[in-house]
């Protein structure tokens, strides 16, 4: 029998319109903005990031640096989804503790980069939404920068920018450090003082144009003596 609910007032069947399949979407990722940058010199390396944590037009935190100290000679900068940044850095720190207990020494910057590549590649079907840059000293005491994509491909660079303002910072670094497509220019070694000032200048410029970058700049200066930090205020609007 046909129920009364399926019939109209005149006793005829109601017309039903099929609108097509409905796709229920679930996104496990969010983009929390922020910018990271690393520069390598002859005997030093810099890793810098802003401290703004945002989503869309909302600022969740004004004091959330994206630089994480791994060893006495290695710092990692992470930008992207903040939850994945925290999870990934905790995994790296646990691996470093296991390595130190087993080998009675700290892992080198190059070994950390290789380990991170395997961690990211192992999650390639559900990747961490994180852009990573490692800065530190290599076995010979020279500055080294390693940049990654979200699924583990990496390379060693002299300088690299990542995050929401990377498209603004990378051309400036190409010009001021890499001397790309410049003729009759003397390429002098980059001093630590000039590198720090350059990092401050490019972040101040980026904060003027990128709404996801701002509040403050944290610079980690890595030398054989250890890691020194500097905080520089940026615009807060």
Swiss-Prot record:
- InterPro entries xref list: Ntn_hydrolases_N, Proteasome_bsu_CS, Proteasome_sua/b, Proteasome_suB-type
A GO BP entry is: proteolysis involved in protein catabolic process
Keywords of the record: Cytoplasm, Nucleus, Proteasome
Cellular component aspect of the GO annotation: cytoplasm; nucleus; proteasome core complex; proteasome core complex, beta-subunit complex
Pfam families listed in its UniProt record: Proteasome (PF00227)
- UniProt xrefs under Gene3D superfamilies: Glutamine Phosphoribosylpyrophosphate, subunit 1, domain 1
Report the domain of life of the source organism.
Answer: Eukaryota
Subcellular location(s) of the protein: Cytoplasm; Nucleus
Disulphide bond pairs? none
UniProt lists the family membership as follows:
Belongs to the peptidase T1B family.
Function as written in the Swiss-Prot or TrEMBL entry = Non-catalytic component of the proteasome, a multicatalytic proteinase complex which is characterized by its ability to cleave peptides with Arg, Phe, Tyr, Leu, and Glu adjacent to the leaving group at neutral or slightly basic pH. The proteasome has an ATP-dependent proteolytic activity.
The record's subunit annotation is: The 26S proteasome consists of a 20S proteasome core and two 19S regulatory subunits. The 20S proteasome core is composed of 28 subunits that are arranged in four stacked rings, resulting in a barrel-shaped structure. The two end rings are each formed by seven alpha subunits, and the two central rings are each formed by seven beta subunits. The catalytic chamber with the active sites is on the inside of the barrel.
What is the name listed in the Swiss-Prot or TrEMBL entry for this protein?
Proteasome subunit beta type-1-B
User: Native species of this protein?
Assistant: Carassius auratus (Goldfish)
- Which gene carries the instructions for this protein? psmb1-B
